[in-house]
Amino acid sequence: MNELTPPPEALTDPNAVEFARIWAAHRQQHVSLRVEQWKHNPGVWGIMLSDLAHHVANAYEQEGVGTREEVLQAIVSVFLAEFAEPTDAPTGGMVD
């Protein structure tokens, strides 16, 4: 497997929790989520998605692939288009 290394802060915090994993396998996207942490406030996922977009934009800028603003604009544009007219219908269920 080709896993990412956890962030250093996660390794030093005994209360750290992983709440999402996204994999590409067999030419499809596969996701594992821990939703119980924000079970009564699903809107918090909107903050997480926004934070993730900003991290991606920072990474692209550091790699020299456009400015942070250009990358964020591209992410938001495609997100809104995909949200309005999905190109896929995620399936699956809860497992332990």
Task: Give the label of every model feature segment.
Residues 1-96:
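Solvent-exposed interaction surfaces and binding hotspots enriched for charged
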